Amino acid sequence: MTKRTFGGTSRKRKRVSGFRVRMRSHTGRRVIKSRRKRGRDRIAV
């Protein structure tokens, strides 16, 4: 059996790929737009 190596840190996740971070850049807004268009329940982390 292999160890589960992904710990996961909430603060780090939010800082990297949270909604407010996405809205800062043009490409981030494009991500939000495409996820809305696709009908994702979770737009950002």
UniProtKB/Swiss-Prot annotation:
<comment type="similarity">
    <text>Belongs to the bacterial ribosomal protein bL34 family.</text>
</comment>
<feature type="region of interest" description="Disordered">
    <location>
        <begin position="1"/>
        <end position="45"/>
    </location>
</feature>
<dbReference type="GO" id="GO:0003735">
    <property type="term" value="F:structural constituent of ribosome"/>
</dbReference>
<dbReference type="Pfam" id="PF00468">
    <property type="entry name" value="Ribosomal_L34"/>
</dbReference>
<keyword id="KW-0687">Ribonucleoprotein</keyword>
<keyword id="KW-0689">Ribosomal protein</keyword>
<protein>
    <recommendedName>
        <fullName>Large ribosomal subunit protein bL34</fullName>
    </recommendedName>
</protein>
<dbReference type="GO" id="GO:0005840">
    <property type="term" value="C:ribosome"/>
</dbReference>
<dbReference type="GO" id="GO:1990904">
    <property type="term" value="C:ribonucleoprotein complex"/>
</dbReference>
<feature type="compositionally biased region" description="Basic residues">
    <location>
        <begin position="10"/>
        <end position="45"/>
    </location>
</feature>
<dbReference type="InterPro" id="IPR000271">
    <property type="entry name" value="Ribosomal_bL34"/>
</dbReference>
<dbReference type="GO" id="GO:0006412">
    <property type="term" value="P:translation"/>
</dbReference>
<dbReference type="InterPro" id="IPR020939">
    <property type="entry name" value="Ribosomal_bL34_CS"/>
</dbReference>
